[in-house]
């Protein structure tokens, strides 16, 4: 399939970070709101908000987020940001997207956790009112923060769970804060009924994936380190865990040093529930259509595969069964021409 055909395919995305996915035009709009001076050209601005080409690890990659954080400190800014990411997704025929963000990073201007979360929800509502897309939010705990901070975040935002805020995540510095360190906050979120996904396996640490699966988390973001761990892959399949793959991001962070270290083929062969994601559209300089093209070029991924992966995403989405059925029906109809 050529790029235009891939663009036309209906898509779903479970793993997309708000602060890592803002368009350059949105960044300029947000900066103007706080009188922050930006480089005159987009090429110069892009260098500030994209991961450096010479990233050595996840830590280097995460530094790109520091530039955007000060721009997301008001309700209006968060609304605009959420709308912007929904717009980008809708323009490449994403039918369902979950956008994740850490409300704790938007408190410097005086917002509360609830206010920051509600602002993102409102931005998603505005996007859905404009475009033919279903957009949901996930709140992220940050693994480098004390468990008590993450527990407070989940306790505070859990009452907002409903039609738009649908779940939670843990992101951040995995190398220094492995899964077992986060266990108390994970268990708190689970006790509150927060559906969880969890970043694991981005730092050559398969044990973090295994521990997350053992803790009963149904979705794993990245899971890159399982590529040469057949017993772990078997456990992923056995438990029905869904994997949120992020190819471009993993190559940038060196979670996968080469395509051979990316777990797609091993997971697919084993029958694991795979999904395709951007991770961070801007930081990784990618789109979901570009990700599809990379899978097709690297692995020979077919339209039938893409349909299966999208159906996996709908099965794993934190939404009611009626919404899942509607989305499945739409996907089957949209892919009938290609499969």
From Swiss-Prot:
<feature type="binding site">
    <location>
        <position position="172"/>
    </location>
    <ligand>
        <name>substrate</name>
    </ligand>
</feature>
<feature type="binding site">
    <location>
        <position position="15"/>
    </location>
    <ligand>
        <name>Zn(2+)</name>
    </ligand>
</feature>
<keyword id="KW-0862">Zinc</keyword>
<dbReference type="GO" id="GO:0009117">
    <property type="term" value="P:nucleotide metabolic process"/>
</dbReference>
<dbReference type="GO" id="GO:0009168">
    <property type="term" value="P:purine ribonucleoside monophosphate biosynthetic process"/>
</dbReference>
<feature type="binding site">
    <location>
        <position position="17"/>
    </location>
    <ligand>
        <name>Zn(2+)</name>
    </ligand>
</feature>
<dbReference type="InterPro" id="IPR006330">
    <property type="entry name" value="Ado/ade_deaminase"/>
</dbReference>
<protein>
    <recommendedName>
        <fullName>Adenosine deaminase</fullName>
        <ecNumber>3.5.4.4</ecNumber>
    </recommendedName>
</protein>
<keyword id="KW-0546">Nucleotide metabolism</keyword>
<feature type="binding site">
    <location>
        <position position="199"/>
    </location>
    <ligand>
        <name>Zn(2+)</name>
    </ligand>
</feature>
<comment type="function">
    <text>Catalyzes the hydrolytic deamination of adenosine and 2-deoxyadenosine.</text>
</comment>
<comment type="similarity">
    <text>Belongs to the metallo-dependent hydrolases superfamily. Adenosine and AMP deaminases family. Adenosine deaminase subfamily.</text>
</comment>
<feature type="binding site">
    <location>
        <position position="17"/>
    </location>
    <ligand>
        <name>substrate</name>
    </ligand>
</feature>
<feature type="active site" description="Proton donor">
    <location>
        <position position="202"/>
    </location>
</feature>
<dbReference type="GO" id="GO:0006154">
    <property type="term" value="P:adenosine catabolic process"/>
</dbReference>
<dbReference type="GO" id="GO:0046936">
    <property type="term" value="F:2'-deoxyadenosine deaminase activity"/>
</dbReference>
<dbReference type="GO" id="GO:0004000">
    <property type="term" value="F:adenosine deaminase activity"/>
</dbReference>
<feature type="binding site">
    <location>
        <position position="19"/>
    </location>
    <ligand>
        <name>substrate</name>
    </ligand>
</feature>
<keyword id="KW-0479">Metal-binding</keyword>
<keyword id="KW-0378">Hydrolase</keyword>
<dbReference type="GO" id="GO:0043103">
    <property type="term" value="P:hypoxanthine salvage"/>
</dbReference>
<dbReference type="InterPro" id="IPR001365">
    <property type="entry name" value="A_deaminase_dom"/>
</dbReference>
<feature type="site" description="Important for catalytic activity">
    <location>
        <position position="222"/>
    </location>
</feature>
<feature type="binding site">
    <location>
        <position position="279"/>
    </location>
    <ligand>
        <name>Zn(2+)</name>
    </ligand>
</feature>
<dbReference type="GO" id="GO:0008270">
    <property type="term" value="F:zinc ion binding"/>
</dbReference>
<dbReference type="GO" id="GO:0046103">
    <property type="term" value="P:inosine biosynthetic process"/>
</dbReference>
<dbReference type="InterPro" id="IPR028893">
    <property type="entry name" value="A_deaminase"/>
</dbReference>
<dbReference type="Pfam" id="PF00962">
    <property type="entry name" value="A_deaminase"/>
</dbReference>
<dbReference type="GO" id="GO:0005829">
    <property type="term" value="C:cytosol"/>
</dbReference>
<dbReference type="InterPro" id="IPR032466">
    <property type="entry name" value="Metal_Hydrolase"/>
</dbReference>
């Amino acid at each position: 399939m050529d790029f235009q055909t891939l663009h036309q395919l209906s898509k779903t995305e479970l793993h997309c970070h708000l602060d890592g996915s803002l368009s350059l035009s949105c960044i300029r709009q947000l900066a103007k709101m706080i009188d922050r001076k930006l480089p005159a050209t987009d090429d110069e601005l892009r260098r500030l908000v994209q991961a450096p080409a010479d990233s050595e690890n996840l830590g280097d990659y995460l530094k790109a987020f520091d530039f955007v954080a000060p721009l997301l400190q008001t309700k209006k800014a968060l609304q605009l940001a959420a709308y912007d990411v929904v717009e980008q997704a809708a323009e490449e025929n994403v039918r369902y997207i979950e956008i994740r963000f850490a409300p704790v990073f938007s408190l410097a201007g005086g917002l509360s956790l609830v206010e920051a979360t509600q602002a993102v929800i409102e931005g998603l509502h505005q996007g859905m009112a404009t475009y033919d897309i279903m957009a949901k939010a996930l709140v992220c705990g940050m693994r480098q923060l004390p468990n008590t901070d993450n527990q407070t975040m989940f306790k505070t935002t859990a009452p907002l769970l409903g039609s738009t805020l649908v779940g939670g995540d843990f992101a951040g510095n995995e190398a220094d804060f492995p899964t077992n360190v986060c266990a108390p906050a994970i268990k708190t979120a689970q006790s509150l009924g927060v559906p969880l996904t969890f970043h694991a396996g981005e730092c050559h640490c398969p044990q973090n994936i295994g521990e997350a699966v053992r803790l009963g988390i149904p979705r794993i973001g990245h899971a890159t380190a399982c590529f040469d761990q057949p017993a772990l892959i078997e456990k992923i399949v056995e438990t029905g865990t869904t994997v949120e793959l992020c190819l471009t991001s993993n190559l940038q962070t060196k979670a996968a040093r080469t395509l051979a270290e990316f777990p797609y083929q091993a997971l697919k062969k084993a029958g694991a529930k795979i999904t395709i994601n951007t991770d961070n559209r801007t930081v990784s300089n990618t789109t979901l259509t570009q990700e599809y093209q990379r899978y097709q070029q690297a692995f020979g991924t077919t339209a039938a595969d893409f349909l299966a992966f999208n159906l996996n995403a709908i099965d794993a989405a934190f939404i009611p069964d009626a919404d899942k059925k509607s989305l499945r029906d739409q996907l089957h109809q949209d892919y009938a021409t290609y499969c």
